[in-house]
């Protein structure tokens, strides 16, 4: 179905809905993006007047008004009608055209005697890849002709190390003012290499540029003195034009800067991979809040940092934080009496806390020992009364001197001069067996204070009680010599 010229001057949506037949709404303008693909399909086709037909001839529809009709493009040859030059029709093609046209670049200064071939292969580089225009592809090929490949070893220029893809990126940026990342260049190289290898596998004919490109990708430029001098002359000039180069070889973009005096972070460089607007906004807000807030103490600064991080929450403590200014700690004035009194109070409170902690530790130690006695199967019911004395071990104070420790009595549990193991000691009563040891004067002197008084009253006052004690059974000198209690 044909469209009238007046339809483009009115509401298009309303007029298109009124049609019930087939509508051709796709037009191809010469030199457009899609035209490059069609020219590659028909490189030698010549558009004639017969290639364009009227709408009446295709749809076989008699129109009432015979105004000049739009010509539909036939067989995809890219013919353009003069009627498409109207402002209403031309507006539909402006969005599809490339907005940034790359200026024409002459490479005769660097490659004398070489002229760019205008073959179908050059035109096919732009097919399906809007980011790699013809100018960028030419700069890409020029960079490959300059850079010599040396395995994985980087090239040192101006005290900085650069890889091949990074140098290609710099050259493209310098020549076309369009930036390509190292990852984009690496992918582009792999695509070209795979495409050419597939052509070789299918026994297809390669053009001269494809052969040259495959050789440059695999082997790089020829390593001659002339090529080396040309390489360093060009890339030293490119690197000198850059703002700065760090020691690691990473470049500082021209338009990327962090202003401490400004209100935030400005990121406008085309040398960087574009970041999302949300991340950029977070960075700017963080810089603004960080510059605005002047933390008086490290605690306030840490609180400010954690409050701005997702997943963290600052809960106010019960004790108020002392607002100390950092200048107070660095004053050269002598400390007054108030500062000494504060230090003295702090030391006293620390001692009290230490005493309380020792009491708590001793309490839980006694509880754990009592529980161990109860769970010990060797511990009989007849000796339960003695476990109380065993659990009440004397706690050596931390402030005890060496002389006090040396003057402490020797333990009364003897095993040929060696103390018994802990499991055996805790399973036995406090008083020794056999009872004849109680009459030994040296033994009484070796007991602690509270045990000495206990045995003085209990054993020495009524020795007849132990004359016929059942513990005297099976008492032999051998048992006495070994110090066994049973």
Curated annotation (Swiss-Prot):
Residues 372-410, 465-486 are annotated as: Disordered. Residues 377-388 have a biased composition (Low complexity). Residues 125-199 bind DNA. Gene3D superfamilies: TEA/ATTS domain. Keywords: Acetylation, Activator, DNA-binding, Nucleus, Phosphoprotein, Transcription, Transcription regulation. The modification Phosphoserine is found at residue 325. One of its GO terms (biological process) is negative regulation of transcription by RNA polymerase II. One of its GO terms (molecular function) is RNA polymerase II cis-regulatory region sequence-specific DNA binding. It is found in: Nucleus. The keyword Transcription regulation applies. SMART domains: TEA (SM00426). Its main location: nucleus. Residues 472-486 have a biased composition (Polar residues). PROSITE patterns: TEA_1 (PS00554), TEA_2 (PS51088). InterPro entries: TEA/ATTS_dom, TEA/ATTS_sf, TEC1_TEAD_TF. The modification N-acetylserine is found at residue 2. Present with 530 molecules/cell in log phase SD medium. Belongs to the TEC1 family. TEC1 is involved in the activation of TY1 and TY1-mediated gene expression. It is not involved in mating or sporulation processes. PANTHER family: PROTEIN SCALLOPED, TRANSCRIPTIONAL ENHANCER FACTOR TEF RELATED. This is Ty transcription activator TEC1. The lineage of its organism: Eukaryota, Fungi, Dikarya, Ascomycota, Saccharomycotina.
